[in-house]
């Protein structure tokens, strides 16, 4: 079986809090988690966990977050074909009462076109 996923790479920061500060307030969250996100990225990692070596075309910046992502994709056996951007994309996720608010910081100014693949 072969699988190819195309999408946006996100570093997801999820935090649990009972209060969202405004203005000059500060507040300490109860818990947090950091993971890789984006629909295509999530699907590629799921396939890899199931023993299928997927191909993934997704954004990647040459910064520490992008290098961390590349390293983890390599560890999972994902054939990663990066679409270069200047900075990594982040999602800040705030779950509350079964719903979730999301703030995204995304660089979608691609430096290069889609890579040519021979798979």
Question: How would you describe each model-predicted region?
Answer:
Residues 26-27, 34, 49-119:
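Conserved N-terminal subdomain of the carbohydrate kinase-like
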Residues 1-57, 64:
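Glycine-rich phosphate/adenosyl-contacting loop at the front of the ribokinase-like
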